[in-house]
Amino acid sequence: MTDLTSLTLAEARKGLASKTFTSLELTDAHLKAMEEARALNAFVMETPDQARAMAREADARIGKGEAGPLAGIPLGIKDLFATKDVRTTACSKILGNFVPTYESTVTSQLWRDGAVMLGKLNNDEFAMGSSNETSCFGPVGNPWRREGSNTTLVPGGSSGGSASAVAALLCMGATATDTGGSIRQPAAFTATVGIKPTYGRCSRWGIVAFASSLDQAGPIARSTRDAAILLRSMAGHDPKDTTSVDIPVPDYEAAIGRSVKGMKIGIPREYRLDGMPAEIEKLWSDGADWLKAAGAELVEVSLPHTKYALPAYYIVAPAEASSNLARYDGVRYGLRVSGKSIGELYENTRAEGFGPEVRRRVMIGTYVLSAGYYDAYYIRAQKVRTLIKRDFEDCFAKGVNAILTPATPSAAFGIGEKGGADPVEMYLNDIFTVTVNMAGLPGIAVPAGKDSQGLPLGLQLIGRPFDEETLFSLGEVIEQAAGRFTPVRWW
């Protein structure tokens, strides 16, 4: 039998339907792969007993002809999603051994459709990071290495565990979240496909909040088709999330293979950065050529406020984070470090519970929201955000169907190589992705090539609100032209 872990989700679904193998066999193959890949540190909690029980239930349903769209498919869940009776920590000490008594909407929809949970995946603490180095469980290793080197690289962040596990064939797909690039950047670093849907497309209920007006859940998968299948189950209106949008969920998979002839693809001139590596330039130009060869029309567009996106993002996101994280005080749940007074209890708990990056962002957020600086920083950043959104609206009003950009300014870097003394160096990783969150638009990262050291590089497509289907159609064109990339196993 083929190694079951090498199948795509779509192929596994066919195999299960034709009874070529069972969900239990598929699940066991992935559990074995997880055991062998512990060096990657992708999973922070493995749930083998639960996985096997869910697989048996899926097999019974398949046998009765009652299979859901994801029946028997083993998935990994980012540790930001609340999972009933399974520890959920956001990879922070402050949540300790918190075990939710409820299930997030996104994961409950995956279980409704028959998926199997393999365990919880590592991420940057409270999703704050671009390299998966801020987790209290330690950094995640990227399955990819530079040719001829033994240096362990980062998988990107904050959804580094999700991207690493999918790239290393430990799960058939994974949930992830994206606040400023946390799905698309790790996908680009690991040669996986990651889509950040339109804000409001997937419910945020039961997901640990970082920046509520920017956070959005989405899948990381092995192919555009797999990502489309997963997004259909994850998306949908949820009355429990006031920002969830009541728009019917289309069959995203039907968009795979759809003609892109006549589509207008915008190439934004502001994304041509000074000192951009020639490899990234070439990748971008290759992507444009592939879309043109498929019948799309390329047009240069202008997004004039792009250069203000990163500074505005690093005001808005920490401001919302400082408000959201105020609930972690050691009183009701999670870590509790006692003190002589309530103030001391808060101080001691937060000092011990929050890692340095989270503390930094909470302090930035508290500063920009303080009385003397609120107008100068926070209000101005929100005005910039409106201008960024307007740039995209103007572009789409001219008939542009999607915008093509690089996903990241470089390939993956080594653990500990960036951001030590200067956090801004790490923040610059999100330069191509934050605009999409600021405008609430959908964006997909698709593997498109390799750099001179054999590391994967990705391209990003940005779409109109709630037009993820076009992104899947265009993404699949790039995927077919570039081919599939798999890492050489070292773990």
Curated annotation (Swiss-Prot):
One GO process term, biological-process aspect: translation
E.C. code: 6.3.5.7
NCBIfam families: gatA (TIGR00132)
The species this protein was found in: Bradyrhizobium sp. (strain BTAi1 / ATCC BAA-1182)
GO molecular function, one term: ATP binding
Swiss-Prot/TrEMBL keywords: ATP-binding, Ligase, Nucleotide-binding, Protein biosynthesis
Role noted for this protein: Allows the formation of correctly charged Gln-tRNA(Gln) through the transamidation of misacylated Glu-tRNA(Gln) in organisms which lack glutaminyl-tRNA synthetase. The reaction takes place in the presence of glutamine and ATP through an activated gamma-phospho-Glu-tRNA(Gln).
Keyword check for Manganese: no
Membrane-spanning parts: none
Family: Belongs to the amidase family. GatA subfamily.
GO cellular-component term (any): glutamyl-tRNA(Gln) amidotransferase complex
Name assigned to this protein: Glutamyl-tRNA(Gln) amidotransferase subunit A
Active-site residues, as the UniProt record annotates them: K78, S158, S182
UniProt enzyme class: ligase
Statement: the UniProt record of this protein carries the keyword Oxidoreductase: no
Binding partners and assembly: Heterotrimer of A, B and C subunits.
Record field: catalytic activity: L-glutamyl-tRNA(Gln) + L-glutamine + ATP + H2O = L-glutaminyl-tRNA(Gln) + L-glutamate + ADP + phosphate + H(+)
Pfam families hit by this protein: Amidase
